Amino acid sequence: MKYNLNQLFKNHRIKGLSTNSKTVKEDEVFFAIKGQNVDGNDFINDALNNGAVLVITENKNNTAIDKVIYVEDVHKALYEAIEIFYPKKPKNLISVTGTNGKSSVVSYIAQAYSLLKKKAAFIGTIGLEIFGSNNIINDVPSLTTFDYLSFRKVAHNLAEDSIEYLAFEASSHGLEQGRLGKTKVNIVSFTSFSQDHLDYHHTKENYLLAKLKLFTDHLLPSGIAILNSDIEEIEFVKDYLHNNNVKFITVGKKGDLQITKITCSLTGQNIDFIFNNIIYNLHTLIIGSFQASNLLIAALTLYYTGFKFDEIIEALAKVKPIKGRMERIDGTNIFVDYSHTPDSLEKALIELKNIKLHGSKLSVIFGCGGDRDKTKRALMGQIAAKLADNVIITDDNPRFEDPKLIRAEIIRGIGTATYTEIASRAEAIKYGINNLKQDDILLIAGKGHETYQIIGDKKLPFDDSEVVRKYLFEISYTRN
């Protein structure tokens, strides 16, 4: 029997849709979808007990249960239902992918629109942030890329709130798993590419091709792709997009928007660049020369949505850094950064090494996550030993792995260089601070914005920035 979902939902006065039996609300429809690890059909009774008014499934074995309706394709039914319940989206959709830099770029884009008096929002690793509205959207997932239903719920609510611009991150996992569904966007960008997530994608080529799905599957025919020209695989990416009839522009030292000079300090940077044969200068409080391309990707995003470059530069000069991205703690020489890949750790260390005063030392504290890409651990140890004067190895979300073994894999990459191993991350931070001398710099890498430490299946409260602030206060109080 075929069902008219629109009529069916009207008959039952449906209030919403859900694919999670734990969070489904009263009078919502539960779609029993088989995922990679969990089958929603195993939780139909849970969903009904939690208030689901209907269950949609493609598993005929469950249709004997009252309120359970069989369809041939549950994903197709879900997409149809989404168009009924959450049809609206902000007029301008912008998506960003890349190994590093996604969170920074979507934040810069939304901030810049807001500074130009437009209502904007961004979605990503650090969550959902809305500019120009006091409304709060609940039930936001803690994923870099939301599942399609969650994305459309949020996008619909933002559109209802008159948000005009939505920038969101697209992770390789999210793209590979089809979390964006049939979403089409106006502008996409590629910030960077380096080794990560090989535990999931197995090869770097698979990882790259997963990211390129954003450009071939989700960009409107009238849209444009913005690429970082300094990506090592840029020629392959350009050929791939050209063969798929994707229009693109590049940003970087050899880009169509050409960065000609970057002057960095502990308080910010000056970026000189040429675009359309005009020389521009951008002064920003955001630290890190690797952020120059991120800022200018944001600049081109605004340009291709109708803004003039002079007003864009004026807005970007006022953009603030986001939590945990080269975050300088209260004017000290202590930085907290999310760098958790070999490439991002190397860039952060090189940046701080270049701007530290002659004769001062650079220290780094970091660990590696458990149950994640193991191949990067020794490499990150090698990078830290090469670039930092003092290396402190600690724990970072060990999950179900033995943290001592994770640290040992990192230390293997350090080789004969000296290092300090401190299991407790809080104690490692205190040790790093205690050993700082005048003008020394300390980088605390890996967790960035995170406010937890994952041990086993428990998320324990932990925030690098707050640990630093608390300890600095304790030191100050003791001295006074």
Curated annotation (Swiss-Prot):
Motif annotated as Meso-diaminopimelate recognition motif, chain positions: 396-399
Residues annotated as signal peptide: none
Transmembrane segments: none
GO cellular component, one term: cytoplasm
Cofactor: Mg(2+)
Subcellular location: Cytoplasm
UniProt binding sites for UDP-N-acetyl-alpha-D-muramoyl-L-alanyl-D-glutamate: 21, 144-145, 171, 177, 179
Residues bearing the modification N6-carboxylysine: 211
Keyword entries, A-Z: ATP-binding, Cell cycle, Cell division, Cell shape, Cell wall biogenesis/degradation, Cytoplasm, Ligase, Magnesium, Nucleotide-binding, Peptidoglycan synthesis
Entry-linked SUPFAM superfamilies: MurD-like peptide ligases, catalytic domain, MurD-like peptide ligases, peptide-binding domain, MurE/MurF N-terminal domain
Pathways per UniProt: Cell wall biogenesis; peptidoglycan biosynthesis
Maturation and modification: Carboxylation is probably crucial for Mg(2+) binding and, consequently, for the gamma-phosphate positioning of ATP.
GO biological process assignments: cell division; cell wall organization; peptidoglycan biosynthetic process; regulation of cell shape
Amino-acid positions noted as binding ATP in the UniProt annotation, renumbered to this chain: 98-104
Domain of life: Bacteria
Catalytic reaction equation(s): UDP-N-acetyl-alpha-D-muramoyl-L-alanyl-D-glutamate + meso-2,6-diaminopimelate + ATP = UDP-N-acetyl-alpha-D-muramoyl-L-alanyl-gamma-D-glutamyl-meso-2,6-diaminopimelate + ADP + phosphate + H(+)
Chain's role: Catalyzes the addition of meso-diaminopimelic acid to the nucleotide precursor UDP-N-acetylmuramoyl-L-alanyl-D-glutamate (UMAG) in the biosynthesis of bacterial cell-wall peptidoglycan.
Record's protein name: UDP-N-acetylmuramoyl-L-alanyl-D-glutamate--2,6-diaminopimelate ligase
Species of provenance: Rickettsia prowazekii (strain Madrid E)
Classification lineage: Bacteria, Pseudomonadati, Pseudomonadota, Alphaproteobacteria, Rickettsiales
